[in-house]
Amino acid sequence: MTSNLEAQLLALRQEGEQAIAAADTLERLEELRVSYLGKKGQLGALLRSMGQMSAEERPKIGAIANTVKEALQASLDKQRESLESAQIQAQLDAETLDVTMPGIYKPQGRIHPLNGIIDRALDVFVGLGYTVAQGLEMETDYYNFEALNTPPDHPARDMQDTFYLPDGNLLRTHTSSVQIRYMEKEEPPIHIVAPGRVYRRDNVDATHSAVFHQIELLAIDEGLTFTDLKGTIKVFLQAMFGDLPIRFRASYFPFTEPSAEVDLQWNGRWLEVMGCGMVDPNVMKSVGYNPEIYTGFAAGFGVERFAMVLHQIDDIRRLYASDLRFLRQF
């Protein structure tokens, strides 16, 4: 019986090693492991007959059985390693990039030229210690006109057509209304810059739009003078346009006195770029400030005009057309 069982064990080893070597998938290899070395496998079935052997025969058969088990396990490990390596290599081959193929196009967004001007301007003023203030686009007549020294019968109202709403409110014609609301809530000293969209009943053409953007600044403190205003504007324009000549021309605005227009020498000619002036005492009084104690200055400019000058844009309507051929230039 011993020689018969020994022969069966050796035959099982030979058969198992051949089957394992022929396995071409990890799933098939696992099936063979269970078939030969599992609890109900072929090797276990042969070893269960050892109970009928004598005590002298069992050690010999046990040693042979261990050798067979170790040999089959070694074959399984070797084949598994080989199959796993082949599987990884196949995956790498399938994922190998063809460097001659064009990549996947991922378009990048760009900053709109108007947003770019607003960001640059705010960076300058924030660097000078100004706070960014926001306000309502739908305003009352009081905040848009009356508090800014422009009563209902004032001739300055003819300077700009206004969009009036059925409820008596209006679409703001400038961001100066932000300054009034801010001053009502805060005590001097004040240094704010107010960007925003404004509305006027202009005929749309190459240089005019019914909706555009303004940025206005306001400073209120004791002892502020026109010299402080000129210095602030000079620093700002140098940051935006470089060290170019500027000049101040006497002008009129109902909410500043004295008032001035600011011109910039650009490509050999003077361009009007800003309006400015010292805050009118009547504006101070409308928000409860004492003009005998405080003085202030204000200035403003159109964002679209700055964008058109800096980027050499010939038609303001291009800024609103959402034409990617145009916007991709910035």
Swiss-Prot record:
<dbReference type="GO" id="GO:0004826">
    <property type="term" value="F:phenylalanine-tRNA ligase activity"/>
</dbReference>
<keyword id="KW-0030">Aminoacyl-tRNA synthetase</keyword>
<feature type="binding site">
    <location>
        <position position="257"/>
    </location>
    <ligand>
        <name>Mg(2+)</name>
    </ligand>
</feature>
<dbReference type="InterPro" id="IPR045864">
    <property type="entry name" value="aa-tRNA-synth_II/BPL/LPL"/>
</dbReference>
<dbReference type="InterPro" id="IPR004529">
    <property type="entry name" value="Phe-tRNA-synth_IIc_asu"/>
</dbReference>
<dbReference type="GO" id="GO:0000049">
    <property type="term" value="F:tRNA binding"/>
</dbReference>
<comment type="similarity">
    <text>Belongs to the class-II aminoacyl-tRNA synthetase family. Phe-tRNA synthetase alpha subunit type 1 subfamily.</text>
</comment>
<keyword id="KW-0648">Protein biosynthesis</keyword>
<dbReference type="GO" id="GO:0005524">
    <property type="term" value="F:ATP binding"/>
</dbReference>
<dbReference type="InterPro" id="IPR006195">
    <property type="entry name" value="aa-tRNA-synth_II"/>
</dbReference>
<protein>
    <recommendedName>
        <fullName>Phenylalanine--tRNA ligase alpha subunit</fullName>
        <ecNumber>6.1.1.20</ecNumber>
    </recommendedName>
</protein>
<keyword id="KW-0547">Nucleotide-binding</keyword>
<dbReference type="InterPro" id="IPR010978">
    <property type="entry name" value="tRNA-bd_arm"/>
</dbReference>
<dbReference type="InterPro" id="IPR004188">
    <property type="entry name" value="Phe-tRNA_ligase_II_N"/>
</dbReference>
<dbReference type="InterPro" id="IPR002319">
    <property type="entry name" value="Phenylalanyl-tRNA_Synthase"/>
</dbReference>
<keyword id="KW-0436">Ligase</keyword>
<dbReference type="GO" id="GO:0005737">
    <property type="term" value="C:cytoplasm"/>
</dbReference>
<comment type="subunit">
    <text>Tetramer of two alpha and two beta subunits.</text>
</comment>
<keyword id="KW-0479">Metal-binding</keyword>
<keyword id="KW-0460">Magnesium</keyword>
<dbReference type="Pfam" id="PF02912">
    <property type="entry name" value="Phe_tRNA-synt_N"/>
</dbReference>
<keyword id="KW-0067">ATP-binding</keyword>
<keyword id="KW-0963">Cytoplasm</keyword>
<dbReference type="GO" id="GO:0000287">
    <property type="term" value="F:magnesium ion binding"/>
</dbReference>
<dbReference type="Pfam" id="PF01409">
    <property type="entry name" value="tRNA-synt_2d"/>
</dbReference>
<dbReference type="GO" id="GO:0006432">
    <property type="term" value="P:phenylalanyl-tRNA aminoacylation"/>
</dbReference>
<dbReference type="InterPro" id="IPR022911">
    <property type="entry name" value="Phe_tRNA_ligase_alpha1_bac"/>
</dbReference>
